[in-house]
Amino acid sequence: MKIDIVPTPGRLLKRYKRFLADIQLPDGAELTIHCPNTGAMTGCAEPGSLVYYSDSGNPARKYRHTWELVETPAGEFACVNTARPNQLVGEAVDAGVIKELQGYPLKKAEVKFGDQNSRADWMLSGSSELPDCYVEVKNVTLCLHGRGYFPDAVSTRGQKHLEELMSVVRNGKRAALVFCVNHSGISVVSPATHIDARYGALLSEAIEAGVEVLAYKSEITPGEIRLTQKLEVTPFDSEAF
């Protein structure tokens, strides 16, 4: 995925009100940009980090610039724009990168599914040999000692999605949860049970019920992101803290 990044990054001054961030440009000027991420962004919003952002070119927008990537003080890249993971996974399915989700001629975004009338990020269909597959995508940027965790804050929405995926399996369809790992420092993924205990419990329940849980890591450079590497998903380890 190509991203039209403004050539010169800024330095993060602060993130606030969830959807806003102030950055300092190389000439010393300050700019307020849109932060498309409702999570805690732990480790990805440290003052002084390099912020790579895009420009919509739309003067009618109150905040025409959007925060896309961050380079942490440790030199690691992360994609903080939560609109990107769905696109990345869709591209990776089309390119054959996610082997587990091949064999479907049709792919549709934002399809209603489940008992609670949620929307799947993708529905794969049209196979004469495989049941339709409902795919939920989650962005993973919380990195602690090389391990990625999801969620980075208590997520009732994430809990609901796991319940919906289990209902899909009960009804004879396929359900897949794809952790889109958008932090260069992550080498393995686990549920953040220390942050959201119910999510961790539901993930274990979902795996037992037959929901397929996958993790794929992106290769990030300023201007381009693409999924390239499958990672292991392991249980939460309390001894890691």
Swiss-Prot record:
Gene name of this polypeptide: sfsA
Matching Gene3D superfamilies: 2.40.50.580, 3.40.1350.60
What would be an example GO MF term here? DNA binding
> Can you tell me which family this protein belongs to?
Belongs to the SfsA family.
Q: Name one Pfam family in it.
A: SfsA
Classification from the root reads:
Bacteria, Pseudomonadati, Pseudomonadota, Gammaproteobacteria, Oceanospirillales
* Organism for this UniProt entry: Hahella chejuensis (strain KCTC 2396)
Recorded protein name is Sugar fermentation stimulation protein homolog
| Superkingdom classification of source | Bacteria
Report the coiled-coil segments: none
